[in-house]
Amino acid sequence: MAKMIAFDEEARRGLERGMNQLADAVKVTLGPKGRNVVLEKKWGAPTITNDGVSIAKEIELEDPYEKIGAELVKEVAKKTDDVAGDGTTTATVLAQAMVREGLRNVAAGANPMALKRGIETAVASVSEELLKLAKDVETKEQIASTASISAGDPSVGEIIAEAMDKVGKEGVITVEESNTFGLELELTEGMRFDKGYISAYFMTDPERMEAVFDDPYILIVNSKISSVKDLLPILEKIMQSGKPLLIIAEDIEGEALATLVVNKVRGTFKSVAVKAPGFGDRRKAMLGDIAILTGGQVISEEVGLKLDAVSLDMVGRARKVVVTKDETTIVDGAGDAEQIQGRVNQIRAEIDKSDSDYDREKLQERLAKLAGGVAVIKVGAATEVELKERKHRIEDAVRNAKAAVEEGIVPGGGVALVQAGKTAFDKLDLTGDEATGAQIVKIALDGPLRQIAVNAGLEGGVVVEHVRGIEAGHGLNAATGGYVDLMAAGIIDPAKVTRSALQNASSIAALFLTTEAVVADKPEKTPAAPAGPGGGEMDF
């Protein structure tokens, strides 16, 4: 395919136009008075959302250079969402502000590499100040406030705080759709580990990229499975029962994997295969934990158990399993409560005996998985469109609350960035274009607060100047239009969200500024369809 190449200013301006189109669509959603965006779907009803990353994903531009610019900013939103579950719109606003200021300086003759160094130094300094500003989450109310702001709904914040209180910060919180109206919290014993399906063909829900099975059998094997001959006896027994199967093994490959995939695709037999978590002795121990939790046995030749001789009573059971590309959750295993408690006590004893911090940390993780459990938030709504949007917001709010527990909380509403900037730049000793790079960051830090004010119908510049002049920790409550002590009013953000948004935005901005050429696919001109044959002269 032929390529188009643009250089210098033409290349950068093309990227900027694409970035601006995407950022302008996303930034209207920022803050409590942010608007919604309607996304057309090829099938079904349109989606209404105020989630930055969902909007960004939908935007596809026609111009090749603009398309690349938009894709780069999508990466900012996606990366921030992956790390912290929120802050996608903030990251987009920051990236747009940095690129706009940066390109102005590059056009005026500044050295892009020096600007990049200045931006990186300034961002590191501001990130450090943000972590100093952060206060540890001490109360259930603070978790509720953080999650409420992310979801835009106080009732969501309360239910997430309740869930975290019950399962602890090590526990797992999942969100499910419900047929009833409103929100429900269901606490279930369960376990999650960091291994996903071996093949994407095992998915049952392509939209969420998950394999979800109710009431499955769970086969736990401490070896590789490559021959289908070894698997057949137990597969036949499970197929007769009509239940799905989760296989956890060191690896599944060759004809064994091919057989499972073919049967799954044809709809003959539902199954999903995942690799066992951990390595070496730790893997053995974790497989043992899963076996006790599900009431099964670890099939291992070390203890004289062969795969072709497995009976149904050696296979574990659970109420539900959810497998994504990265992790597996086993909900409500059918294991004996006494045996599970015995295993928990054994791990606690090992923690007390261990003198290695690393071993102790890994044992603590195993303990949390066995004893922590899973909280399920069931969400219902009047329409399918509202249900999807609400569920997505709650999932983001859960990640947001976990981020708050991890690195602490800072004043919300874009104020933390403005106030961290007040002290961060005093320590920097930069000259020339590097100092200009730092100045670009300083100007960009006002962006989120300015946009929140604009979305609330206020004058952005006036609000930013007012916040700079008032007491630290105080800022705009955009919902009421007043200036308050943000922490006391529960207007807070996780430090991790704010820090990730800034770091990801600066990373992409630096790439924009140092771009000297863009190579894009040349759009193909589709030839017009040939004219059809004439109808001829016909008499009737």
Curated annotation (Swiss-Prot):
MF annotations from Gene Ontology: ATP binding; ATP-dependent protein folding chaperone; isomerase activity; unfolded protein binding
Reaction catalyzed: ATP + H2O + a folded polypeptide = ADP + phosphate + an unfolded polypeptide
Q: Name one GO biological process term.
A: protein refolding
Note the SUPFAM superfamilies from the entry: GroEL apical domain-like, GroEL equatorial domain-like, GroEL-intermediate domain like
Database matches in Pfam families: Cpn60_TCP1
User: Is the keyword Phosphoprotein in the record?
Assistant: no
Q: Which domain of life is it from?
A: Bacteria
The places in or outside the cell where this protein is found are: Cytoplasm
* EC number(s) from the headed UniProt entry: 5.6.1.7
Per the record, GO CC terms?
A: cytoplasm
Q: Where does ATP bind?
A: 29-32, 86-90, 413, 477-479, 493
Can you tell me which residues the record assigns to a coiled coil?
A: none
Q: What keywords are assigned to this protein?
A: ATP-binding, Chaperone, Cytoplasm, Isomerase, Nucleotide-binding
Q: Which InterPro entries match?
A: Chaperonin_Cpn60_CS (IPR018370), Cpn60/GroEL (IPR001844), Cpn60/GroEL/TCP-1 (IPR002423), GroEL-like_apical_dom_sf (IPR027409), GROEL-like_equatorial_sf (IPR027413), TCP-1-like_intermed_sf (IPR027410)
Subunit structure of this chain's protein: Forms a cylinder of 14 subunits composed of two heptameric rings stacked back-to-back. Interacts with the co-chaperonin GroES.
- Protein family according to the UniProt entry: Belongs to the chaperonin (HSP60) family.
What does the UniProt record say this protein does? Together with its co-chaperonin GroES, plays an essential role in assisting protein folding. The GroEL-GroES system forms a nano-cage that allows encapsulation of the non-native substrate proteins and provides a physical environment optimized to promote and accelerate protein folding.
Q: Which HAMAP family match?
A: CH60
Q: What is this protein called?
A: Chaperonin GroEL 1
State the organism named in the record: Salinispora tropica (strain ATCC BAA-916 / DSM 44818 / JCM 13857 / NBRC 105044 / CNB-440)
